[in-house]
């Protein structure tokens, strides 16, 4: 969110002044590459995988293939942005949910169009895996396990099926 904020540079300077710590705001590509390195250092990923990092201001999709540099797509589809732009009621109305679905689908279709020419063969459900990282995904894993307190040992390498995600969505 900081990299897109109108007052982002001002905010960074204020934090640097108060803490004495230098801050570098990462580009979406840098964030994706670092997420990929972190995930692949801690997860036994197959030769080909897609890593997703749903942040507040953006979502990074990282296509990773053994021995090739990752292909990073940074999309302005963050959880905070989407909620602020589209949701007005709690729980969200069916119309709001539909609008969010449509917005996400359109953005993903646009972002993924160039991937067809990348050195990544078409996905194969039998061999490919989607790996989630960061807050939104770890929150889903915590909810699925009914954790009262975040425990990385319970979250890392946790397998969350599409059915379980759908079940969580219905509960929320």
Segments and roles (model prediction):
Residues 1-48, 63-172:
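Helical "lid/coupling" subdomains associated with nucleotide-phosphate turnover
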Residues 48-58, 62:
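A generic, well-ordered mixed alpha/beta core segment in the N-terminal half of proteins
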């Amino acid at each position: 969110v900081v990299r897109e904020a109108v007052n982002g540079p001002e905010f960074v300077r204020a934090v640097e002044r108060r803490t004495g710590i230098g801050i570098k705001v990462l580009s979406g590509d840098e964030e994706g590459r670092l997420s990929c390195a972190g995930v692949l250092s801690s997860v036994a990923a197959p030769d080909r995988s897609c890593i997703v990092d749903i942040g507040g201001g953006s979502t990074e999709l990282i296509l990773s293939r053994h021995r090739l540099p990752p292909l990073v797509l940074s999309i302005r589809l963050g959880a905070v942005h989407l909620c602020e732009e589209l949701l007005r009621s709690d729980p969200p109305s069916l119309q709001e949910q539909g609008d969010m679905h449509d917005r996400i689908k359109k953005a993903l279709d646009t972002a993924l169009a160039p991937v067809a020419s990348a050195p990544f063969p078409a996905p194969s459900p039998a061999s490919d895996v989607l790996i989630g990282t960061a807050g939104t995904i770890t929150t889903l894993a915590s909810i699925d396990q009914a954790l009262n307190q975040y425990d990385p040992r319970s979250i890392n390498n946790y397998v969350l099926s599409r059915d379980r995600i759908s079940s969580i969505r219905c509960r929320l």
